Swiss-Prot record:
It comes from the Bacteria. HAMAP family: MinC (MF_00267). It comes from Kosmotoga olearia (strain ATCC BAA-1733 / DSM 21960 / TBF 19.5.1). SUPFAM superfamilies: Cell-division inhibitor MinC, C-terminal domain, Cell-division inhibitor MinC, N-terminal domain. This is Probable septum site-determining protein MinC. Interacts with MinD and FtsZ. GO terms for biological process: cell morphogenesis; division septum assembly; regulation of cell septum assembly. Cell division inhibitor that blocks the formation of polar Z ring septums. Rapidly oscillates between the poles of the cell to destabilize FtsZ filaments that have formed before they mature into polar Z rings. Prevents FtsZ polymerization. Pfam families: MinC_C. Belongs to the MinC family. The keyword Ligase does not apply.
Length: 218
């Protein structure tokens, strides 16, 4: 089945093998949870398992947000496959969560993010700490890191080109804003910001950044 629940020694897994569109997937997930509504309680934890084909960062934001609205907490994101009746896990990312603030629904993380940890949120993400290599952040809005930024940073899945990625020390292995990706960018020893200008990602010192807005630059 394209979408199914699997009970393992480590708990319940929602397995997503395939889907035609994110909207159809959301409908299927809601139908699955409706069928099993007597099984779940508010705040229950599950693992979300995707295949290499379905582990799309922009869709992960929507899936995690939907599951939260359905009352369950995603404790980790797995990437693997279903072989016969056995679940084979290739990669595992622990989902880091903190209380959402009142500021536009931003999620504030007050810790360092280590390798194998992932933060997924539909709005802005603010990190008071370092993002180490092997960690990943996926944001619907912007990402601001009060620390050193390594790992993979993906922003703008909800707000698009208006998103920015800023850090006191911005040196990630990959930057993605909306549909644009960059691994080759200017590196500074002072606070820097990545943003989209004239259709490409640019990284500049925060103090001298020239942001593109409708009608020109500021």
């Amino acid at each position: 089945m394209p979408i199914d629940f699997r009970m393992t020694k480590k708990g319940l897994i929602l397995l997503i093998e395939s889907y035609s569109s994110i909207e159809s997937l959301k409908q299927e997930i809601m139908a699955k949870f409706n069928e099993a509504r007597d099984f779940f309680s508010e705040g229950d934890e599950i693992s979300l398992m995707l295949t290499q084909e379905t582990s799309k960062p922009d869709d992960i934001v929507n899936i995690v947000s939907l599951l939260g609205n359905l009352g369950v907490r995603v404790k980790d994101i797995l990437v693997g496959s279903l072989e016969k009746k056995n679940v084979k896990i290739g990669q595992k990312y622990d989902l880091v969560r903190e209380k959402v603030t009142e500021v536009r629904g931003a999620q504030v993380i007050k810790r360092n993010l280590r390798s194998g940890q992932i933060v997924v949120h539909n709005y802005d993400i603010i990190v008071f700490g370092n993002v180490h290599p092997g960690a990943e952040i996926i944001a619907g809005g912007s990402i601001v890191i009060f620390g050193t930024a390594r790992g993979i940073l993906r922003a703008g899945y909800s707000v698009g080109d208006e998103a920015v990625i800023a850090a006191l020390d911005l040196k990630p292995s990959l930057i993605q804003i909306s549909g644009l990706i960059s691994q080759d960018y200017n590196v500074y020893e002072t606070p820097a910001v990545a943003h989209i200008r004239t259709g490409r990602i640019v990284v500049e010192k925060i103090e001298s950044a020239k942001f593109e807005v409708k009608g020109g630059k500021i």
